[in-house]
């Protein structure tokens, strides 16, 4: 797939407690802010929040499935708002630049919550596979 500015893809997912538990198991990130409601209630967040990287991992899924499967070269991320279990989030990646001298593409990456607020923003650089 030849990528050009304006090409984009999206993926939505409702985050479950099982997703959070499995992500914690796979990554060994057992921070109680994500897993222990009693602990998390005492924090500035007032309850458990989803691992930021769990939300960001949907960006990888979009790039790998909706944009022809280019190879990740880099990614910047800003975690703007917390994600809560039960929220439906949508990851979107949009081509904003294609280098003329090399096959390198820059993507704007955004994860939004179900009311359209940005929760994660950033940019990715990718190498198209063809």
Language model: regions and residue ranges:
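Short, charged/polar low-complexity linear motifs in solvent-exposed/disordered segments
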Residues: 28-29, 40, 69, 74-75, ...
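Hot-dog-fold acyl-thioester-processing enzymes
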Residues: 1-70
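Mid-chain, well-packed structural core segment of small domains
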Residues: 65-91
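Short, surface-exposed, polar/charged, turn-prone segments marking secondary-structure boundaries
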Residues: 31, 37-42, 61-62, 77, ...
């Amino acid at each position: 797939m030849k990528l050009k500015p304006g090409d984009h893809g999206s993926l939505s997912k409702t985050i479950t407690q099982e997703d959070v538990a499995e992500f914690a198991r796979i990554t060994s990130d057992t921070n109680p802010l994500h897993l222990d409601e009693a602990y998390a209630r005492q924090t500035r967040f007032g309850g458990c929040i989803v691992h930021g990287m769990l939300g960001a991992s949907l960006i990888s899924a979009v790039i790998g499935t909706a944009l022809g499967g280019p190879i990740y070269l880099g990614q910047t991320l800003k975690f703007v708002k917390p994600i809560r279990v039960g929220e439906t989030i949508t990851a979107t990646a949009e081509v904003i630049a294609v280098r003329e001298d090399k096959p390198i593409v820059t993507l704007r990456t955004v994860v939004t919550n179900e009311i359209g607020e940005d929760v994660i923003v950033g940019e990715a650089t990718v190498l198209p596979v063809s």
